[in-house]
């Protein structure tokens, strides 16, 4: 197989990034935007010894799983990798992704996986689900400001104010901001030169409260003629918070370290279940509130709290899971590295009149081992104990020193919430080699039309 060869391929599998996989005379090709079951014509773009990457040129025979994408930019934009795949098939793909990682990385057998796996929790309406969107700003060839999303693996902006995954209010807000920029000759930020003012716009929406936040990330300290923009934005029903976040760094970090209120208050509120949360521009908050309620409900179900338990919630963010758990537990301790998030968690506990949740700032892999060692010193060698430990780590998973401490504390249950089933499988392998067994495992589709899937696992001490 050589570069620029044109080949006809039947797509027989899906890669972890959503690309179609096919074979030509035993040679494996990865083809972006091809759907399992398609027969396609593809052009080889990169040829290695045993495999290569090809560009989809034409769908010769469409798969039964191929659907018309809702967004005209689906193939070019880097946001939705599998929008041309039917939603039912997306859920099968995500289930297989979790199972594949558990088998390949975790070393679990198919029988073991079949025993514990439950079907992926999907969405009834898998579009318009995001309560948060961050739009980069740039300039077109005519020097007009544009906004949209980055093309896959680039920082080239695909101009689009109407993302199918976001709420309908996003379009109106972005059009108002673009008009304000044109009328007042305000330039978009240029990554290459470091000049220009508007870098990004963050929009948050409360699905239960209908409150809207707009935060403009600016390459400076102020927004010229801000009152003209505010006058238009506050006409949108639900507008609650308009802020700016200064960010003059020459890097890819989106938000600045702080924000200033231009109008309204510095936060919006929303609910997950019956718990109310205060969300600032810098808060971490799950982007799909419909599925988050199911995700946390599953974590609570797996924890099966009776009311007399001590629970640790590691990587607790703004206390989203902690406050859910606190309603059923005797005491909850939350740990999070971001100080602002812990401030939010404490405020959220106060808002909900929850007084049995305590929060600590620090790395989970440092705070828990330090707590364990200190407890042992102060109690004449007696070991610290937790009834349930919940972990919700970033993509890199849990540090091994943290897993060691979890095992030492001998909780009856560990509830592991994961955004990357590969690192989940690695960590489950460690826990299962050290006195635990998986009882239940289930995917929750937080991100329809993308390759990402959350997973919740219950481990029980043997």
Where are the regions a protein language model picked out?
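Terminal RNA-binding accessory module
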Residues: 1-73, 111, 359, 366
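Short beta-strand micro-motifs enriched in acidic
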Residues: 43-47, 136-140, 204-208, 462
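Short, acidic/hydrophobic/Gly-rich beta-strand patch recurrent on exposed beta strands
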Residues: 20-25, 148-151, 215-217, 345
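Extended interfacial segments that mediate partner engagement and assembly in macromolecular machines
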Residues: 57-69, 75-188, 208, 223
């Amino acid at each position: 197989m050589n570069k620029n060869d044109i080949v006809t391929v039947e797509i027989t599998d899906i890669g972890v990034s959503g690309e179609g996989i096919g074979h030509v005379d035993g040679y494996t090709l990865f083809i972006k935007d091809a759907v399992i079951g398609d027969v396609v014509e593809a052009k080889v773009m990169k040829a290695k010894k045993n495999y290569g990457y090809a560009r989809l040129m034409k769908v010769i025979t469409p798969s039964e799983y191929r659907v018309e994408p809702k967004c005209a930019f689906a193939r070019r934009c880097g946001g939705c990798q599998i929008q041309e795949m039917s939603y039912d098939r997306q859920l099968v793909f995500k289930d297989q992704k979790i199972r594949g990682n558990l088998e390949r990385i975790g070393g679990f057998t198919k029988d073991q996986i079949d025993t514990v796996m439950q079907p992926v929790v999907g969405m009834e309406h898998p579009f318009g689900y995001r309560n948060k969107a961050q739009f980069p700003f740039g300039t077109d060839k005519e020097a007009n400001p544009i906004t949209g999303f980055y093309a896959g693996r680039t920082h080239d902006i695909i101009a689009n104010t109407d993302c199918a995954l976001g709420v309908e209010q996003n379009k109106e807000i972005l059009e108002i901001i673009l008009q304000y920029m044109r009328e007042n000759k305000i330039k978009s930020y240029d990554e290459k030169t470091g000049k220009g003012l508007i870098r990004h716009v963050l929009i948050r929406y409360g699905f239960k409260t209908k409150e809207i936040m707009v935060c403009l990330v600016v390459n400076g300290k102020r927004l010229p003629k801000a009152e003209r923009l505010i006058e238009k934005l506050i006409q949108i029903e639900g507008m609650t918070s308009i802020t700016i976040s200064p960010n003059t760094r020459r890097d890819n970090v989106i938000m600045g370290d702080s924000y200033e209120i231009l109008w309204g208050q510095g936060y919006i509120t929303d609910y997950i279940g019956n718990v109310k949360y205060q969300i600032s521009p810098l808060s971490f908050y799950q982007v799909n509130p419909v599925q988050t309620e199911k995700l946390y409900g599953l974590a609570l179900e797996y924890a099966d709290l009776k009311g007399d338990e001590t629970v640790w919630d590691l990587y607790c963010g703004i206390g989203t899971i902690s406050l859910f758990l606190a309603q059923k537990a005797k005491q909850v301790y939350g740990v999070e590295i971001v100080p602002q998030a812990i401030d939010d968690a404490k405020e959220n506990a106060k808002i909900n009149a929850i007084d049995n949740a305590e929060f600590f700032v620090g790395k989970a892999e440092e705070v828990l081992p330090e707590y364990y060692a200190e407890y042992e010193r102060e109690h004449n060698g007696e070991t610290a104990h937790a009834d349930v430990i919940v972990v919700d780590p970033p993509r890199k998973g849990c540090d091994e020193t943290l897993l060691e401490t979890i095992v030492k504390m001998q909780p009856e249950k560990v509830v592991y919430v994961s955004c990357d089933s590969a690192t989940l499988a690695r960590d489950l392998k460690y826990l299962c080699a050290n006195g635990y067994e998986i009882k239940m495992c289930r995917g929750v589709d937080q991100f329809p039309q993308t390759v990402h899937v959350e997973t919740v696992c219950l481990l029980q001490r043997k």
